C-alpha cells in the first residue's frame, strides 16, 4: 500500500489546495493520502480563520483520507520547526512520499540548498552591521519565496529517511492579494474581511461574521 503525506494549514481551504490534493494523488499513485494540518493556530501565530474540525472535514470531503493535527508547539513555529514537526508525524504514519508546492519546482536545486548549512561568515557579517540574529538569518533567505523556504525545510527534515519528495509548481504567490480562481489563502482572508464574495476561489462557506467572531480569540 502506497501512502503519500502532505502538510497543510487550509486557512481556508481553497482551489489551490484542491489542485495540490489532486496532483499529490496523481504523482504519487498513492492508495492513502494523509494530511498533517495545523490546528486552531497557524504558523504566523494567529488563530485560523475557520476552526480545525471544519477545515479537516472539508479536506476529507475533497480527497484527503486522514487528517492528523500538527500540535500548537510546531504549528506556530518558524519554517524549520514547523517542517520538522510535520515530517516527524508523517514518518510515524509510515508514508512513502510527501508532496509539497514550491515556487521554483526544482527539486535538485532545493535539495542542494537543503544539503548546505548556514553560511556563518555571511551571518556574522550581517550581525556586525547591527542586525539581530533572527533578522540576519531572514536576510540570508530573503531571495527565496515562502514555499521554497518550506520546501527546503521539509527536505532537511527528510534527511536519513527513505521518504521520497515530490514537488509541484505553486500556481500563485503567497503575497498576491488578487482574488482569482486560484488565489492565495492570504488574498481570500483579505477579501472576506473586506466583505467580498470569495466563492470564485473557495467552495468553503465562510462568512465575515464567523471570522470576526474568531478574531476576539487572537493572542
Question: Where does each model-flagged region fall?
Answer:
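Short beta-strands and strand-loop turn motifs
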Residues: 6-7, 36-37, 68-70, 166-169
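Short, high-confidence coil segments that cap the C-terminus of an alpha-helix
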Residues: 28-31, 64, 95
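Active-site cores that bind ATP or allylic diphosphates and position pyrophosphate for catalysis
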Residues: 70-219
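N-terminal catalytic cores of NTP/NDP-binding nucleotidyl/phosphoryl-transfer enzymes
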Residues: 1-55
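A glycine-rich helix N-cap at a beta->alpha junction
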Residues: 57-71
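Short, contiguous strand/loop micro-motifs
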Residues: 8, 42-43, 59, 73-74, ...
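Non-catalytic positions within long, well-ordered alpha-helices that form the structural scaffold/packing
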Residues: 25-26, 60, 87-91
Amino acid at each position: 500500500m502506497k501512502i503519500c503525506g502532505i502538510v497543510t494549514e487550509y486557512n481556508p481551504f481553497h482551489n489551490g489546495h484542491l489542485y495540490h490534493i489532486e496532483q499529490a494523488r496523481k504523482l504519487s499513485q498513492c492508495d492513502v493520502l494523509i494530511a498533517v494540518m495545523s490546528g486552531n493556530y497557524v504558523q504566523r501565530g494567529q488563530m485560523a480563520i475557520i476552526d480545525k474540525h471544519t477545515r479537516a472535514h472539508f479536506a476529507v470531503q475533497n480527497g484527503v483520507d486522514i487528517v492528523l493535527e500538527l500540535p500548537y508547539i510546531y504549528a506556530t513555529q518558524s519554517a524549520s520547526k514547523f517542517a520538522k514537526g510535520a515530517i516527524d508525524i508523517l514518518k510515524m504514519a509510515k508514508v512513502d512520499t510527501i508532496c509539497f508546492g514550491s515556487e521554483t519546482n526544482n527539486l535538485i536545486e532545493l535539495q542542494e540548498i537543503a544539503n548546505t548549512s548556514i553560511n556563518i561568515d555571511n551571518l556574522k557579517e550581517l550581525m556586525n552591521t547591527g542586525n539581530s540574529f533572527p533578522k540576519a538569518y531572514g536576510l540570508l533567505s530573503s531571495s527565496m519565496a515562502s514555499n521554497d523556504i518550506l520546501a527546503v525545510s521539509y527536505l532537511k527534515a527528510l534527511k536519513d529517511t527513505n521518504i521520497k519528495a515530490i514537488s509541484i509548481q505553486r500556481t500563485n504567490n503567497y503575497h498576491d492579494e488578487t482574488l482569482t480562481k486560484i488565489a492565495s489563502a492570504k488574498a481570500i482572508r483579505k477579501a472576506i474581511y473586506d466583505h467580498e464574495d470569495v466563492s470564485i476561489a473557495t467552495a468553503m462557506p465562510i462568512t465575515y461574521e464567523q471570522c470576526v467572531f474568531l478574531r476576539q480569540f487572537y493572542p
